[in-house]
Amino acid sequence: NYSYHPLYKELHTVPWDTDVNITPYFTLHKIQGDVNKVISGERLGISVERLGISDKSPINHSSLIANPYFDLVYFDAFAPEKQPEMWSEELFRNIYACMNANGILTTYCAKGVIRRLLQAVGFTVERLPGPPGGKREILRATKTKG
């Protein structure tokens, strides 16, 4: 069981909003917050001017960060039936646009409709065994194009 590995434990105990060098080749910066604010740049402290948006209205889903930022997205929303606004094609398209090439999105929701939605926006999607004692399957979606 990999959950007892020291690196696994370290990943879960590092502070939020801080760069932490896990190994010489891996720096972790955990961001916790509303995914809409994160992908719009608001949560990252990116100004509307930096995004090149002339309109001073609030940033919405279509106002994406010009340069990808994320290598990994752990998507931990409630089930689509409980929180449907978190499972839209538009939201996943925007997350895809904010990810670096070969970036990975993972979610505990392994429903076929979500797998197809992730594929529709460009991810390559795999069903994987879930964690011990929990979900039977999870999804891993990889952005294979830059």
PLM features: residue spans?
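A short glycine-rich, Lys/Arg-flanked "PGG" loop and its adjoining helix->strand segment in the class I
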Residues: 86-101
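Conserved beta-strand signature within the Rossmann-like core of class I S-adenosyl-L-methionine
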Residues: 72, 102-109
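Class I S-adenosyl-L-methionine
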Residues: 111-146
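S-adenosyl-L-methionine
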Residues: 1-42
